[in-house]
């Protein structure tokens, strides 16, 4: 999705002030307060709100606050709205990673693997803040088969002109979306694209 670049000056100033307040509350662990402030910031975005870059990061910040309060259903809603608004050409590895983490905590293995794998393809192992998430993914997918360099972000998003993703990522179409869940033991039968 194409996003509008600059907010009107008065709204930009309000957004910056609210963002600073929200980040301060967030950094101090006052997540509920941060959510309220982010909601205020969201409410001043001109319609359609989804067209502004600020919408994506506000929704991600709201999702992160929910995640850290173990409110996974709410976090899923916020992160998925950020993910959808960003679109496949502007994918943020952190948003994709958090979606994978949330699905994992909601015991949705298929979507957890899907989004953790997307995050891995976008950013490699560096995106994994929690070693347990990387181990979880490695136990389900042979990650070495998905990159020529052992997972340094090679694959979807690393080189948009390379449609074969290093000849490894047969699960993902040209926009990085899954063609379906493939259990780890079944990868060989699909071959390289």
Spell out what each predicted region is.
Residues 41-45, 80-85, 120-123:
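Amphipathic alpha-helical segments of tetratricopeptide repeats
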Residues 3-8, 45-52, 84-89, 126:
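Flexible helix-coil transition and linker loops at the boundaries of alpha-helical arrays
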